[in-house]
Amino acid sequence: LGALFVILAIILKRLAVMVPFLGFPSLKITLEVLPLIVAGLTLQPGYCFIVAIATDFLGLVLANAGGFPFLGFTLNAVLQAEIPCLLKNYLSEKNEKLLERIVKIVMLVISLLGCLYVFKINEVNISGSMYQVTLPIKFTIFVIIAAMLVILFIFIKYYKNKLRQEDLRLFHLSILSVVAIELTVTMFLTPYWLQSMYGIPFFASQFVRILKSCVMIPLGIIIVYTMNRMIQKVIK
């Protein structure tokens, strides 16, 4: 089963696409993190660690990246598998319900901060080129962020009223895992590693990351929960 997660992650990494969005050319959509999250929700910590290391190493080999791998990105892969595993193993149902409320509050706060950040900037540097962030673009981003929140909350309410207790626990874990990884790895660790390696300012890529998170959080929750439910049925 661990090998299946490694293969899926590598395939999805190779299928990453750069999507032009609102005139910006570098919104990279990639789903390789999702099999690692599902692995974390399915396997034990030791196996999750092996899956993450194997995925990172084989990804470098297939990409023909020479030299020693940067351990910061290896840590990213490990966290993407281990965070869901730790949530699964150490959270009681009572704590999950509390953390679900915390996730909603955090999403609201992050969305507001994202809107404030987008509102303050007038131009952004992407791949060495400067792009103007006009008022219509800002308004469109605000609408997208609001739509993402509405979709996420509707999705949570719909499934909470529909699922059995066992499936509801899996659903809670999917939400917590996707949001936790998006905040820790995508929004914090990755820009920090890029700053350490290439001198890219920490906040230089946050504009694009905010846009990406608006897409990836709802999409990630849906895919992770669906994949996990299918795997649980096969295992049983």
Predicted ranges, named:
Residues 1-236:
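Loop-helix junctions at membrane interfaces
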